[in-house]
């Protein structure tokens, strides 16, 4: 008889940082705009954990093992007149993909946004990645006429935590 699968989605904790950074390294290894750098990924996650008003990271555990995560950042939209979210990262470990875990994480994030009265969730996908775009469309996301642009700000102090 097969072991019953125990799947839980819950807020990540600082004890999860190492595993989360490994998931992000795996994600960024496949993205054109970013390079994997475990120290940067750890620093970014710590910045979220130190101020819960900045965002949330949820993990999906299968039988106690983290197999996926979703990272949501909070901001304000003057266009919408309220709080909105940026879905920064959604990643499922390669060995557990195509088993519905990404769907569960995204549905959890959407439910969280609704319960907390966020007005919108925005995300970016790779342009040629039609699989990811189809995945998000299936969950109600629509294309935007907005085109993302970036300006990389180089700093003298690579380890600077804040520029306030």
Which residues does each predicted region cover?
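A short helix-loop-beta-strand connector motif used in the catalytic cores of GNAT acetyltransferases and
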Residues: 47-59, 86
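Conserved GNAT-fold acetyl-CoA-binding loop/helix
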Residues: 22-47
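Conserved beta-strand in the GNAT
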Residues: 59, 65-74
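Conserved active-site alpha-helix within GNAT-family acetyltransferase domains
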Residues: 103, 127-145, 151
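A short beta-loop-alpha structural element at the N-terminal edge
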Residues: 8-20
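A conserved beta-turn-beta hairpin within the catalytic core of GNAT-like acetyltransferases
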Residues: 65, 76-87, 97, 144-145
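Conserved GNAT acetyl-CoA-binding A-motif
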Residues: 113-125
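Conserved acetyl-CoA pyrophosphate-binding loop and the N-cap/start of the following alpha-helix
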Residues: 96, 100-108
């Amino acid at each position: 008889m097969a072991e019953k699968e125990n799947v839980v989605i819950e807020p990540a904790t600082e004890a999860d940082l190492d595993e989360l950074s490994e998931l992000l390294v795996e994600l960024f290894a496949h993205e054109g705009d970013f390079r994997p750098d475990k120290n940067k990924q750890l620093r970014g996650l710590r910045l979220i954990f130190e101020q819960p008003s900045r965002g949330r990271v949820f993990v999906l555990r299968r039988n106690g093992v983290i197999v996926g995560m979703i990272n949501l950042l909070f901001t304000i939209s003057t266009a919408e007149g309220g709080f909105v979210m940026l879905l920064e990262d959604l990643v499922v470990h390669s060995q557990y993909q195509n088993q519905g875990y990404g769907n569960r994480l995204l549905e959890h994030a959407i439910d969280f946004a609704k319960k907390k009265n966020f007005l919108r969730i925005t995300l970016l996908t790779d342009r040629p990645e039609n699989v990811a775009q189809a995945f998000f469309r299936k969950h109600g996301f629509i294309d935007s006429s907005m085109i993302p642009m970036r300006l990389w700000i180089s700093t003298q102090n690579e380890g600077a935590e804040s520029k306030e």
